[in-house]
């Protein structure tokens, strides 16, 4: 029996601390749409974090939805890591 390749899924988040109470979904998709989300993020220099479990927890969200409170801590840790990485790269230039 041939093993099936899992369908790729992606969720893109944005957080504007001046406007948003929590990070919100700006794009979501699976298959080719997910591939395009990832491709555009890479092209724009947006950091990508692969986490299948987190994507599964967010799969029911739609564009402009804020993430549920239960995910605040996990997403905050990811955003913090990305921010620190970004600052580290800027300081090396």
UniProtKB/Swiss-Prot annotation:
Pfam family, one: Bac_export_2
GO CC aspect terms: membrane
A Gene Ontology BP annotation from the UniProt entry: protein secretion
Top-level division of the source organism's lineage: Bacteria
SUPFAM superfamilies reported in the protein's UniProt record: EscU C-terminal domain-like
Signal peptide range: none
Protein name: Uncharacterized protein YlqH
Name of the gene this protein is made from: ylqH
């Amino acid at each position: 029996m041939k093993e099936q390749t899992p369908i790729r899924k992606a969720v893109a988040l944005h957080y504007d601390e001046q406007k948003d109470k929590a990070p919100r979904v700006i794009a979501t998709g699976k298959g080719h749409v997910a591939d395009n989300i990832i491709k555009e993020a890479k092209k724009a220099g947006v950091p990508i974090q692969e986490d299948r479990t987190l994507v599964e927890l967010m799969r029911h969200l739609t564009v402009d939805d804020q993430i549920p409170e239960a995910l605040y801590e996990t997403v905050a840790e990811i955003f913090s890591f990305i921010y620190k990485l970004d600052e580290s790269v800027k300081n090396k230039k």
